[in-house]
Every structure is written in structure tokens, then in C-alpha cells.
């Protein structure tokens, strides 16, 4: 069993006593160094550091988008009408964790309400509810 290392960037920086701005991690997929902007995005999305053979990895934005597309194409389970989701999972909309289907950011309450008021479906992909965040909506041209 591998030793327990930190899985979020804050804990990683504290554990190894390194400034976030000096952090250098490679992408788990393309193996290129993840830029500081992509690391900030990774942190903001509350994604986990991946450990392989005691080596930490993150994920760059380009690979994250490709991963999201791959998961949608290969692990799609179902769609749910946005007005029915709360009854389906028996939680308030504000309490349901929903990530963006394109970039993996967590949707805030206003983004969830956008789906509700615009009758945009939520998707269940690999056991996680997905929608579209405001940044990706603007790229979709809605």
C-alpha cells in the first residue's frame, strides 16, 4: 500500500513546505508541466492530486477537457430534467454536488438555477451529476 500523501494542493504545499507559486507538477495524461494558471484552475475546481509510484500529478486544462469528453462518451448513465433532480436525489438543489460536464468545476447555486429556469437537463456520468458552468455556457453559444 502506498504511503498517505496529501491529495489537495493546499495540503501538498504545507506538507512539502513549498509556495504554490513555486509548485511544479506534471499532467497525469500528457506528462507536460502544468502551468500556474492551470494549477490555480485545478485548485479552484477542488480536484485531487494523483500519486503514482510516490510521484504527484495534476491535470492540465486541455487534458481535463478531453477527460470530461471521454467520460461523457463512455460513462454516461442518464439525463434528468432539472426540475425533477431534487425529487430524484431527495436533496435541495443547493446541496447537490454538480460538476461541469466540460471542465469539472463545481456549479454554484446560480448556475444550477440557470439549468432549472432554462429547462436544461443534468447528466449522470460515472456516478456524478453534471451540468454546464457559466464559463462553458458562454463557449457553447447559449
From Swiss-Prot:
Keywords: Activator, DNA-binding, Early protein, Host cytoplasm, Host nucleus, Host-virus interaction, Inhibition of host innate immune response by virus, Metal-binding, Modulation of host cell apoptosis by virus, Transcription, Transcription regulation, Viral immunoevasion, Zinc, Zinc-finger. A zinc finger (unnamed) spans 27-63, 100-136. The keyword NADP does not apply. It comes from the Viruses. It is found in: Host cytoplasm; Host nucleus. InterPro entries: E6, E6_sf. Pfam families: E6. GO terms for biological process: DNA-templated transcription; regulation of DNA-templated transcription; symbiont-mediated perturbation of host apoptosis; symbiont-mediated perturbation of host ubiquitin-like protein modification; symbiont-mediated suppression of host innate immune response; symbiont-mediated suppression of host type I interferon-mediated signaling pathway. One of its GO terms (cellular component) is host cell nucleus. GO terms for molecular function: DNA binding; zinc ion binding. Forms homodimers. Interacts with ubiquitin-protein ligase UBE3A/E6-AP; this interaction stimulates UBE3A ubiquitin activity. Interacts with host BAK1. Belongs to the papillomaviridae E6 protein family. Plays a major role in the induction and maintenance of cellular transformation. E6 associates with host UBE3A/E6-AP ubiquitin-protein ligase and modulates its activity. Protects host keratinocytes from apoptosis by mediating the degradation of host BAK1. May also inhibit host immune response. This is Protein E6.
